[in-house]
Amino acid sequence: MNLRPLHDRVIIKRLDQESKTASGIIIPDAAAEKPDQGEVLAVGPGKRDDGGKLNAPDVKVGDRVLFGKYAGQTVKVDSEELIVMREDDIMAVVQK
């Protein structure tokens, strides 16, 4: 991947959603909702405050994060679908 996010932007790869329910029902791709979890692939340097101080992002590469269904902008890079979003659009980091 040759993307370097700017400012407080983060590049995320959606995690694959289960295609089968707990009861064994297979969900077709057309009916499945886009997952709202992903892995952080790249993080920008941060956002500057009004005084010009750079605030480092709270997320780091490798974090598993939760975000809204419509958060960010989907881009295709090297035939891979990625999401570019602001750090503010990330709701939580999933603790392991």
Curated annotation (Swiss-Prot):
<dbReference type="GO" id="GO:0051082">
    <property type="term" value="F:unfolded protein binding"/>
</dbReference>
<dbReference type="GO" id="GO:0046872">
    <property type="term" value="F:metal ion binding"/>
</dbReference>
<dbReference type="InterPro" id="IPR018369">
    <property type="entry name" value="Chaprnonin_Cpn10_CS"/>
</dbReference>
<dbReference type="Pfam" id="PF00166">
    <property type="entry name" value="Cpn10"/>
</dbReference>
<keyword id="KW-0963">Cytoplasm</keyword>
<keyword id="KW-0143">Chaperone</keyword>
<dbReference type="GO" id="GO:0044183">
    <property type="term" value="F:protein folding chaperone"/>
</dbReference>
<protein>
    <recommendedName>
        <fullName>Co-chaperonin GroES</fullName>
    </recommendedName>
</protein>
<dbReference type="InterPro" id="IPR011032">
    <property type="entry name" value="GroES-like_sf"/>
</dbReference>
<dbReference type="GO" id="GO:0051087">
    <property type="term" value="F:protein-folding chaperone binding"/>
</dbReference>
<dbReference type="InterPro" id="IPR037124">
    <property type="entry name" value="Chaperonin_GroES_sf"/>
</dbReference>
<comment type="subunit">
    <text>Heptamer of 7 subunits arranged in a ring. Interacts with the chaperonin GroEL.</text>
</comment>
<dbReference type="GO" id="GO:0005524">
    <property type="term" value="F:ATP binding"/>
</dbReference>
<dbReference type="GO" id="GO:0005737">
    <property type="term" value="C:cytoplasm"/>
</dbReference>
<dbReference type="GO" id="GO:0051085">
    <property type="term" value="P:chaperone cofactor-dependent protein refolding"/>
</dbReference>
<comment type="similarity">
    <text>Belongs to the GroES chaperonin family.</text>
</comment>
<comment type="function">
    <text>Together with the chaperonin GroEL, plays an essential role in assisting protein folding. The GroEL-GroES system forms a nano-cage that allows encapsulation of the non-native substrate proteins and provides a physical environment optimized to promote and accelerate protein folding. GroES binds to the apical surface of the GroEL ring, thereby capping the opening of the GroEL channel.</text>
</comment>
<dbReference type="InterPro" id="IPR020818">
    <property type="entry name" value="Chaperonin_GroES"/>
</dbReference>
